[in-house]
Amino acid sequence: MASSDKAFTLDIVTPQKLFFSGEINSVIAPGLNGLFQVLKGHAPLLAALKSGKVRLSLSDRSEDTFQIAGGFFEVSGNKAILLTEEVS
């Protein structure tokens, strides 16, 4: 599918593997002070994450959700990286 003009790249990485790498329209993640959402063009960000649910809105308009065991989230340019110990 063609890249959406609303999409940006997200990598989800655990110590064992690259769990996800692809284009998404948004991500909602569990920050230490509550949920936050990131869209394309977000200001640079580095945030600590607590255990909880992550929701992806994929560029093909589908959604995906999964649990993480805390970690860190970084946004720079139109790329985001979520580092976590475990994803289920």
From Swiss-Prot:
It comes from the Bacteria. The keyword Transmembrane does not apply. This is ATP synthase epsilon chain. Pfam families: ATP-synt_DE_N. Belongs to the ATPase epsilon chain family. One of its GO terms (cellular component) is proton-transporting ATP synthase complex. F-type ATPases have 2 components, CF(1) - the catalytic core - and CF(0) - the membrane proton channel. CF(1) has five subunits: alpha(3), beta(3), gamma(1), delta(1), epsilon(1). CF(0) has three main subunits: a, b and c. Produces ATP from ADP in the presence of a proton gradient across the membrane. It comes from Chlorobaculum tepidum (strain ATCC 49652 / DSM 12025 / NBRC 103806 / TLS) (Chlorobium tepidum). The lineage of its organism: Bacteria, Pseudomonadati, Chlorobiota, Chlorobiia, Chlorobiales. It is a peripheral membrane protein. It is found in: Cell inner membrane. GO terms for molecular function: proton-transporting ATP synthase activity, rotational mechanism. Keywords: ATP synthesis, Cell inner membrane, Cell membrane, CF(1), Hydrogen ion transport, Ion transport, Membrane, Transport. The gene is atpC. The keyword Ion transport applies. InterPro entries: ATP_synth_F1_dsu/esu, ATP_synth_F1_dsu/esu_N, ATPsynth_dsu/esu_N.
